[in-house]
Design a protein with these regions (language model features):
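Bacterial Sec-dependent N-terminal signal peptides
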Residues: 1-22
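N-terminal phosphate-binding or glycine-rich loops at protein starts, especially the Walker A/P-loop
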Residues: 23-67
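Short internal beta-strands
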Residues: 68-77, 158
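Glycine-rich, charge-decorated loop segments at or immediately adjacent to ligand/cofactor-binding or catalytic sites
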Residues: 81-86, 156-178
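Glycine-rich oxoanion-binding loops at beta->alpha junctions
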Residues: 90-120, 132
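Glycine/threonine-rich flexible loop motifs
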Residues: 129-141
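Conserved anion/nucleotide-ligand pocket segment
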Residues: 178-251
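Internal helical hairpin/lid segments
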Residues: 241-314
Length: 314
């Protein structure tokens, strides 16, 4: 009996050790790699609620270690991740730390002002993307890349896995249709992490004038494009779980139509419907909720299809 118990304990220990060995280590967890770079620097961060190192935000970790964080740039949905899609997020102050949150869209050029850019020496990027051409976080990153080149600022990108990084799909964007929901000549599902995409932007000369930026990327460890990565935190209000993230590349196209895609429900991008789509057994009613204050077909009974029961493989 004792031998059996000992064998069981040894097997469990071996499994735990292997699991720890195979665990994906995010860029921001590798503090020994980037803390020396930050010494004596005035730091700005481009992040939001996803920029977590374990149970602490990158901002809090930097401040606890006495680094001089002077500014925050936040993307669509804001630094705390609770603003609506497309909602203008103005300059403010982070209530928890007192660090200024600077606007990304100042003046006629819709980019950070000269005064904002002169506040810091180095920009840290730590944000969770989902690997789609129309997901706006990478577009904000590209805008910041451009202005960092203009003001000769170094950029440190702490990379994270791409939850849709196991495949590439869709046509490459015709750049005459470049917009706020399509910024680079890449497929709809591009398969890259933000770090890989940033390196590609540099390598392909995609910044205006083919300018290069001073970029360092702290890559993930134990991550490959065959790795199935479950996001620990929803990246935005209407992508609350992996089902929404997996369906988003397909269902998002219908946002240009009057059809509701479940914004204002518990199943955003997992259902679709319209008041006039009679004949379907499934129905739902979009409501005003945080992250979807005024969703399409607000307070109207929509008939349609529930995709939430599909398997991830489908």
């Amino acid at each position: 009996m004792k031998k059996l118990l000992l064998l069981t304990l040894l097997l469990c220990s071996a499994f735990l050790c292997q699991a720890q060995k195979d665990r994906i280590i995010l860029g921001d967890e590798q503090t020994s790699e980037y803390f020396p770079i930050l010494k004596d620097k005035k730091i700005a961060i481009f992040s939001n609620h996803t920029g977590m190192i374990g149970d602490k935000h990158l901002l809090d970790v930097l401040l606890e270690n006495k680094f001089n964080v002077v500014a925050i740039f936040s993307p669509e949905h804001g630094f705390r991740g609770n603003a609506d899609a497309g909602e203008h997020v103005s300059s403010s102050v982070d209530s928890k730390t007192g660090v200024p949150i600077l606007s990304l869209y100042e003046g006629k050029d819709k980019k950070p002002s000269k005064a904002s850019m002169q506040k810091f020496d180095i920009l840290i990027i730590d944000i969770q993307d989902v690997g789609l051409r129309f997901y706006t976080y990478y577009i904000t990153m590209c805008r910041l890349m451009d202005v960092c080149v203009e003001y000769n600022k170094k950029v440190l990108l702490l990379d994270r896995p791409n939850p849709n990084g196991h495949y590439v799909d869709g046509p490459i964007l015709d750049m005459k249709y470049k917009s706020g929901v399509g910024w680079l000549p890449i497929p709809i599902v591009h398969g890259m992490t933000l770090g890989e995409l940033a390196l590609m932007v540099n390598g392909e000369g995609w910044l205006p004038g083919s300018r290069k930026w001073d970029l360092a990327v702290i890559k993930c460890k134990n991550y490959t494009h065959q790795t199935k990565y479950q996001l620990p935190i929803p990246p935005s209000p209407n992508l609350p779980n992996m089902k929404s993230i997996y369906l988003y590349p397909s269902t998002c196209f219908f946002e240009a139509t009057p059809v509701s895609l479940g914004r204002g429900t518990s199943l955003p991008f997992q259902v679709y419907g319209h008041p006039n789509m009679t004949g379907y057994n499934y129905s739902f009613t979009p409501r005003s909720i945080p992250g979807a204050k005024n969703p399409p077909q607000l307070n109207k009974l929509c008939h349609g299809v529930d995709l939430s029961t599909m398997s991830d493989e489908e």
